Amino acid sequence: MARVKRGVTTHARHKKVLKQSKGFVGRSSTNYRIALERLEKALRYAYRDRRNKKREFRALWIQRINAAVREQGMTYSQFIAALKAANIELDRKVLAAMAFDDPAGFTAIVEAAKAVRG
């Protein structure tokens, strides 16, 4: 039986890791052993942060809405409760964008929410 040599597959695997670690600093991009560790850690961070990103953006939208609503004399929680009572189904992403890009439209929504609130 012939001896199996794995030089080709090993070389391909090393090349793949080094290609993915391109842009890392120092030996993290040139030395396979170090590059593999850095790449594994980078991929773990990427996986974690794809989930964190959703939380962080929601928090940012809430902060922006809160700041815009306070200028109109309401708090964020009062505003959201009034929106639900008025059956205005705009999500926080859209509300934050409106507060930033279309202040007049956002003011109209706040006034509609205030009217329902009483």
Curated annotation (Swiss-Prot):
Keywords per UniProt: Ribonucleoprotein, Ribosomal protein, RNA-binding, rRNA-binding
GO CC list: ribonucleoprotein complex; ribosome
Entry keyword Iron-sulfur: no
Keyword RNA-binding (UniProt): yes
PROSITE patterns linked to this entry: RIBOSOMAL_L20
Any GO MF annotation of the entry: rRNA binding
CDD domains hit by this protein: Ribosomal_L20
GO biological process: ribosomal large subunit assembly; translation
InterPro entries on file: Ribosomal_bL20, RIBOSOMAL_L20_CS, Ribosomal_protein_bL20_C
Biological role stated in the UniProt entry: Binds directly to 23S ribosomal RNA and is necessary for the in vitro assembly process of the 50S ribosomal subunit. It is not involved in the protein synthesizing functions of that subunit.
Entry similarity comment: Belongs to the bacterial ribosomal protein bL20 family.
Protein name: Large ribosomal subunit protein bL20
The species this protein was found in: Acidiphilium cryptum (strain JF-5)
Upper classification of the organism: Bacteria, Pseudomonadati, Pseudomonadota, Alphaproteobacteria, Acetobacterales
Gene transcribed to yield this protein: rplT
